[in-house]
């Protein structure tokens, strides 16, 4: 069994309302990191997590213990005890719904002390409302919530995911404007993590890739940036 230094270990709680895709997300990560060859599949029945379960995965030399938590509040004590051992949290939302009770409880439990990331699942559904869900999250919780990616659609059909730090010239006018506005929000949050970056940003200078990465890392660690990523766990 491989032994890891303590500074190379991370406990990550996976939180969210029941049915949002927490377990499927862990299965997708396990498949991507080659822990398993089982491809995540959508079940005909709703799978419920009753107890915390741990899935260890390795990435870039780090060992991540992914802690799957119950989405129903009959098991709230299980979630609280899991959070006490967590270094960070991933809050999973369903793109076809609005903020749910489990989402609210997840934000309540993580508070401001635990670094967090939001994963919006099921963006390939025709019922997905990603943009509206982002606006709802920012209005209800914090303008520190900012997308790192936006889904691209043709009509109601999902086509791709765009990294907002990438060039937008290949996007349609509608999505180019959305990407540029989102990038502006992120860049301001990045600049606010460091006085030197803030001075550089407001003087109109471009931040380097290294400065952007440093700002994102510091911002997440301090709770000044809550990044949003998106995807579909069953499409991996």
Q: Where does each model-flagged region fall?
A:
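P-loop NTPase catalytic nucleotide-binding module
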Residues: 1-20, 94-235
């Amino acid at each position: 069994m491989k032994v890891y230094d303590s500074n190379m270990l991370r406990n990550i709680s996976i939180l969210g309302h029941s049915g949002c895709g927490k377990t499927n997300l862990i299965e997708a990560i396990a498949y991507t990191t080659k822990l398993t060859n089982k491809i995540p599949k959508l079940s005909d029945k709703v799978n419920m997590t009753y107890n915390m379960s741990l899935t260890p995965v390795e990435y870039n030399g780090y060992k991540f213990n992914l802690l799957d938590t119950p989405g129903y509040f009959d098991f709230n004590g299980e979630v609280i005890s899991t959070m006490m051992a967590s270094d960070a949290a991933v809050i999973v939302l369903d793109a076809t719904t609005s903020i749910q009770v489990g989402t609210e409880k997840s934000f309540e439990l993580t508070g401001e002390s635990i670094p967090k990331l939001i994963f919006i699942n099921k963006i390939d559904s025709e019922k997905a409302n990603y943009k509206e869900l982002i606006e709802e999250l920012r209005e209800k919780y914090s303008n520190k919530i900012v997308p790192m990616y936006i889904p691209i659609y043709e009509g109601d059909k999902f086509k791709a995911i765009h990294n907002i730090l990438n060039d937008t010239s290949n996007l349609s006018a509608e999505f180019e404007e959305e990407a540029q506005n989102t990038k502006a929000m992120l860049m301001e949050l990045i600049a606010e993590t460091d006085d030197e970056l803030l001075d550089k940003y407001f003087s109109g200078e471009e931040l380097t890739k290294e400065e952007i990465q440093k700002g994102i890392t510091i911002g997440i660690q301090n709770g000044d940036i809550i990044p949003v990523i998106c995807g579909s766990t069953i499409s991996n």
